[in-house]
A protein has these predicted regions:
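Basic, helix-initiating cap at the start of DNA-binding domains
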Residues: 1-27, 31-43, 57-60
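Amphipathic alpha-helical segments used for helix-helix packing
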Residues: 88, 101-128, 176
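Alpha-helical DNA-contacting segments of helix-turn-helix folds
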Residues: 52, 60-66
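Amphipathic alpha-helical packing segments from all-alpha helical-bundle domains
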Residues: 68-71, 75-76, 87, 102, ...
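Hydrophobic alpha-helical connector segments
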Residues: 61, 75-108, 160-167, 207-208
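Short hydrophobic/aromatic patch on the recognition helix
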Residues: 42-52
Length: 209
């Protein structure tokens, strides 16, 4: 009985999160209330508060839920003992693009994120949360690239800072363009070639000034 209750609680939590994701994308994070989410999920506001302190915590839980399936690849690439950090990092970038292309929930999350990062974003508290997560992600990229340099997989002259900026902006740009114009290219099919082109540029350019 206790196990069933735990399973039901997890199902309720997942339902709340998925309904919130759709409403956030459709109506905006700021204008979507917890009452709106409760109605869509078929639960009470109290049920939401049982799982989440507030809307910010709910949004952050959604963010981490989207990131979790790929985190092991990025974590491996920032491990100083990993023998192939560049390989793990390359696979991570490819899988990010493929996952967005094939998973509607990830597409919704990126649409929300891109909207929230605009200068006139309506909810500064969640925008700050996103900025913190992006800064941590960029730092992890720098660690991955540094490990690759130390392993001789990238040139010692590589500017890790510039490389991280290039990769972050390129991946975001590919996702944003694909979300706006699916017909321009096949993100899932082209993911490996696009990422390999970026890695090639790191091997041959972006040296220190």
């Amino acid at each position: 009985m206790a196990r069933r209750t735990k399973e039901e609680a997890q199902e309720t939590r997942s339902t709340i999160m998925m309904e919130a994701l759709g409403l956030f994308c459709q109506h905006g994070v700021a204008t979507t209330s917890l009452s709106d989410i409760a109605r869509a999920a078929g639960v009470t506001r109290g049920a939401i508060y049982w799982h989440f302190k507030d809307k910010e915590e709910l949004f952050l839980a959604l963010w981490h839920e989207m990131c979790a399936p790929l985190s092991h690849l990025l974590n491996a690439s920032i491990d100083v003992d990993e023998p192939d950090p560049l390989g793990k990092f390359t696979t991570f970038l490819i899988e990010v693009l493929r996952t967005v292309a094939m998973c509607p929930a990830h597409q919704l999350m990126f649409r929300i994120m891109f909207k929230m990062m605009q200068p006139d974003s309506e909810l500064t508290s969640i925008r700050a949360l996103i900025q913190d997560e992006i800064q941590q992600h960029t730092q992890n990229m720098r660690c991955s690239l540094t490990n690759a340099v130390h392993r001789g997989q990238l040139p010692s002259t590589l500017s890790v800072e510039r490389a991280a900026i290039l990769l972050h902006c390129s991946v975001d740009g590919l996702i944003m363009n694909w979300l706006n114009q699916h017909e321009r290219f096949d993100l899932a099919a082209d993911a490996e070639a696009l990422v390999q082109a970026l890695i090639f540029s790191l091997r041959h350019n972006l040296g220190q000034p």
